[in-house]
Design a protein with these regions (language model features):
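Post-signal peptide N-terminal segment of mature Sec-exported envelope proteins
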Residues: 29-49
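C-terminal motif of bacterial Sec signal peptides marking the signal peptidase cleavage site
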Residues: 17-19
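Short edge beta-strands and adjacent turn/loop segments
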Residues: 59-84
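Bacterial signal peptide processing site
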Residues: 21-23
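Long, charged/polar, surface-exposed segments that mediate recognition or autoinhibition
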Residues: 86-114
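A mature extracytoplasmic/lumenal domain signature
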Residues: 80-84, 132-136, 146
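A short amphipathic beta-strand at an alpha->beta junction
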Residues: 104-141
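Bacterial N-terminal signal peptides that target proteins for export
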Residues: 1-8
């Protein structure tokens, strides 16, 4: 159960990158919704670069190893490493499935709770994806993809 808490806490740390919960103004929402694909890509690359400068950090349990923008589907991709879990093999099949379900559920809940992130996804048509890795670099769960339809 302690490992589950660590996994959920890393997700909360990663989701803090979304900023404050104030939300976008009406003008910002309109600007986001009127962007074409090239403009969305430019903003996405700039956002990923800014997030890399401010959010690539490390604490006792987690490390945000990379934040990048994937232009093919307008997605900000976070790569997180849980330092206390050496390998996915420490979980049996039932525990891994439960971990996967919990990470997906909590991830969607936290991202959708944040107004800025929700506005960015709904009006800007962006998505967020989290890849959670063990200390050895192997995936702990399937990628957690959150889009506007999840909110």
């Amino acid at each position: 159960m302690n490992k589950m808490f660590v996994c959920l806490s890393v997700l909360a740390v990663a989701l803090a990158a979304g900023g404050c919960r104030g939300g976008a103004s009406a003008q910002q929402k309109q600007d986001l919704s009127h962007m074409n694909a090239r403009q969305r890509d430019k903003v996405g690359y700039e956002a990923a670069a800014n997030l890399r400068r401010t959010e690539l950090k490390e604490d006792a349990d987690t490390r945000v190893t990379n934040i990048r923008y994937r232009a093919s589907d307008d997605t900000l991709v976070y790569t997180l490493m849980l330092k206390k879990i050496s390998s996915p093999e420490v979980f049996n099949a039932v525990q891994r499935r439960k971990l996967d379900v919990t990470l997906h559920k909590e991830g969607r809940k936290e991202v959708c709770r944040n107004r800025n992130m929700r506005d960015l996804m709904i009006h800007g048509r962006y998505s967020v994806e989290y890849r959670v890795l063990a200390r050895n670099g192997k995936a702990l769960s399937s990628p957690i993809r959150i889009s506007a339809k999840d909110c």
